[in-house]
């Protein structure tokens, strides 16, 4: 009797599952066989920032990446979907048709997993991550920016920056050091050498220290080849460090200053803007120092992912620069007006900060 009294309130007065629980379970089933659902260590891809319209950003990214991906690697090949059974072969074939349909669904899910470009959850607002498979992200993105830089043809509206991510690891200092020792070898290990800078940005992460990360990475680059030197004005290579939650994204890119920090909105109008600069500013830009433009300022003010009230800080001490360069002073310049490109960027927002070495 007591057991009946305890059970009776449950159907009518017990706690009911919220809608979010059902939606979450449905999403989990929908993602079965679709590859990684979110940004995680061990994948490659392209990190894209946008301005408050992530869905449109994903659409633009697919369109742009497929256009240039087909140009570089050829069109994607998929299984013929017309081979599915029609179901009109009689009742005896119903079981066989159902089995073939299930096999076809499994193949379709496998095909989805092997898609060349696939959007996954980045873990930060106004940031889209497109996982890539079978391509080299840094070469593809460089090809896109090079073409846009030459043609000056604007192909996107909401995409701001497009950064290739050649490798990901756990966002802990020891994991990053161990991973970077082998990751950076193709560019900096003897006999390879070059000038470099380090660009650091963190989102939704509070346990990483930017000074420690920069110091350790600069030390690794210097240990690979003593001839690797820091160049803050026009480096051959830029080491991009993007941290989102507990994942560290790494890449080494070329022409970072020439392509306006890989900003698609700035690349198309850089020539026009340079013609309007005064001789002093033009000379600075010609030497590889980037001048911030009004449109660039507006985009960064409207983009929470890039941070609000950004500042550029030049860490010019021997500890941050590593064994290759030592300078003595530190300058802080507000990022509200046109100015030369400096060594570091630090976003003083609650969720992100950026630092260029």
From Swiss-Prot:
This is THUMP domain-containing protein 1. Residues 1-38, 74-95, 276-357 are annotated as: Disordered. PROSITE patterns: THUMP (PS51165). Signal peptide: none annotated. InterPro entries: THUMP_dom, THUMPD1-like. Interacts with NAT10. Binds tRNA. It holds the Pfam family THUMP. The modification Phosphoserine is found at residues 8, 86, 88, 119, 270. Belongs to the THUMPD1 family. One of its GO terms (molecular function) is RNA binding. The keyword Cytoplasm does not apply. Residues 147-254 form the THUMP domain. The modification N-acetylalanine is found at residue 2. It comes from the Eukaryota.
């Amino acid at each position: 009797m007591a057991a009946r009294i305890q059970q009776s309130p449950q159907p009518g007065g017990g706690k009911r599952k919220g809608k979010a629980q059902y939606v979450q379970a449905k999403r989990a089933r929908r993602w079965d066989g679709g590859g990684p659902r979110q940004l995680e260590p061990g994948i490659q891809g392209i990190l894209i920032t946008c301005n408050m319209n992530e869905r449109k950003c994903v659409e633009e990214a697919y369109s742009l990446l497929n256009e240039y991906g087909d140009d570089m690697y050829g069109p994607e090949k998929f299984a013929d979907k017309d081979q599915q059974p029609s179901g009109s072969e009689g009742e005896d074939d119903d079981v066989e048709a159902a089995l073939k349909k299930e096999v076809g669904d499994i193949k379709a899910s496998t095909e989805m997993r092997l898609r060349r470009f696939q959007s996954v959850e980045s873990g930060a607002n106004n940031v889209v991550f497109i996982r890539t498979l079978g391509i080299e992200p840094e070469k593809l993105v460089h090809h896109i920016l090079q073409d846009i830089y030459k043609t000056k043809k604007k192909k996107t509206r909401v995409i701001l920056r497009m950064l290739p991510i050649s490798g990901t690891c756990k966002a802990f200092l020891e994991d990053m050091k161990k991973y970077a020792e082998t990751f950076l070898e193709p560019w900096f290990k003897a006999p390879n050498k070059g000038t470099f800078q380090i660009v650091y940005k963190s989102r939704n992460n509070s346990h990483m220290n930017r000074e420690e990360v920069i110091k350790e990475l600069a030390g690794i680059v210097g240990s690979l080849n003593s001839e690797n030197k820091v160049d803050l004005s026009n480096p051959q290579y830029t080491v991009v460090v993007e941290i989102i939650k507990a994942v560290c994204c790494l890449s080494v890119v070329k022409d970072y200053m020439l392509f306006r920090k890989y900003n698609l909105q700035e690349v198309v109008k850089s020539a026009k803007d340079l013609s309007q600069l005064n001789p002093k500013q033009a000379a600075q830009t010609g030497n590889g120092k980037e001048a911030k433009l009004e449109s660039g300022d507006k985009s960064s003010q409207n983009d929470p992912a890039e941070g609000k009230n950004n500042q550029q800080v030049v860490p010019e001490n021997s500890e941050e620069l590593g064994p290759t360069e030592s300078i003595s002073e530190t300058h802080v310049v507000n990022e509200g007006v046109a100015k030369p490109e400096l060594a570091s960027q630090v976003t003083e927002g609650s969720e992100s900060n950026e630092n260029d070495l």
